[in-house]
Design a protein with these regions (language model features):
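Conserved hydrophobic/aromatic packing and binding residues within compact polymer-binding modules
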Residues: 14, 28-29, 39, 67
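Recognition helix of helix-turn-helix/homeodomain-like DNA-binding domains
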Residues: 33-48
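Short, basic-rich loop-to-helix N-cap that marks the start of a DNA-contacting helix
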Residues: 45-58
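Short C-terminal boundary/hinge segments that cap the last helix of small helical domains
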Residues: 61-71
Length: 71
């Protein structure tokens, strides 16, 4: 598990990546595949598991550290 501040940064980065690459959270949830409620929870409450962040980084083809950068 990671610190709350970092998990919130990861959730915000996920929101940005979805916005840049998909027309909606629903479209991303279908493509990933992930339950829409889980996508919403990650965006609003953060991502607490490092392996989940790593999987998302690989999916979006961005470096793992990109989930913790402030933009």
């Amino acid at each position: 598990m990671i610190e709350k501040a970092f998990s919130l940064l990861a959730g915000e980065r996920l929101r940005q990546l979805i916005k840049e690459n998909y027309s909606s959270q629903e479209e991303f949830a279908f493509d990933y595949p992930m339950d829409l409620r889980t996508v919403s929870r990650y965006i609003n409450n953060g991502i607490t598991k490092i392996d989940t962040i790593q999987e998302l980084a690989e999916f979006f083809k961005v470096p793992f550290i990109a989930f913790f950068e402030v933009k």
